[in-house]
């Protein structure tokens, strides 16, 4: 996905914020989880970021209270989704697409909601020949009828840290699902109509 120098580097501080925020939040919510070493280093190297996150994630009366910077989070989710969709489906023009960004934290999701989110969608249509995703679907074939079905599996980039899935949605647009630290669940829909 091409990007000018300014655009590509303009996300750095937001990416650092989102990564550190999510890791610190996970450590605050889940006993037994210890934040990553690179998160601790980033926070010790950037006192302003450390203070900001300490202000946004607090333990009050035994409960974790937090307030994420939704603009930064949405901006990073959109950047990631555009990159994944462009990588998997080759060329997609996002310029005039309507975009819907949904996200929620694991501790706010029911088991049914997680299972629905985790579903592996069947691909009824395939992207253009030559795109990465046109050679990576999981194909199941009924040996009796010969009927074949294609499914889009999750791409696990870092185990328990980051994974994503790209597929055509029910409306004919492109959807990208992202899970970060097994804490943040996000779905970004692009209506390409």
Regions found by a protein language model. Name each.
Residues 1-2, 32-48:
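Short Fe-S-cluster ligation motifs
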Residues 2-22:
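Short Cys/His-centered divalent metal-binding micro-motifs
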Residues 7, 22-37:
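A broadly used, surface-exposed interaction patch
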Residues 14-17, 51-64, 130-139:
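Hydrophobic transmembrane alpha-helix bundles
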Residues 15-18, 27, 36, 46:
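Alpha-helix initiation and N-capping motif
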Residues 27-31, 45, 103-104:
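Short amphipathic alpha-helical patches
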Residues 41-82:
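Short flanking/linker segments adjacent to small metal-binding domains or redox-active Cys/His motifs
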Residues 70-193:
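C-terminal, charged low-complexity interaction regions
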